[in-house]
């Protein structure tokens, strides 16, 4: 209701099991005449692979994994900065688990949370993502200065606010063009990186961990990521 705090992360009191999730997914598909993809968003946590396995069996079309380094204007800072695991580890473990269970082809994986530049996109695709999504990077393109005051509704740049006097500070046309410039630049950079790898399509990069090497990572981290040390 207006005037009350938003709870983030929001609880889902109608989902306490995979069976509950399956029923919700089925209901949503029925309500949309099976014309819309159903996306289930999960946090990057220590048992994310097991959770994703259940989601894949629920009938959902897409799993969205959110890494702990992602930005949010609603969650308490202690939650935002300390709860969860890096998206790279979560993504790699989910992709591997679904492959081992023979159900990777049944569902798509998208990821976000700390996707800050084109190289992050390349790494995510190589670790098994079908696509990525961005939020903070897009806000920066619009003109966000990372004031970290989204939750107050007093964004000085007119982005995270509903106040008319602040909203008018944001020029939609200029903001749109800046975002287009960002994505076009990333596309160009990704093409260059793939060219350096000798790869000519995103499909050839997807899940291709042979293209990655680890620097300063522990043996366990390398094992989870499914990559080798630099120099190997």
Sequence positions of predicted segments:
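ATP-dependent carboxylate/acyl-activation modules
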Residues: 1-7
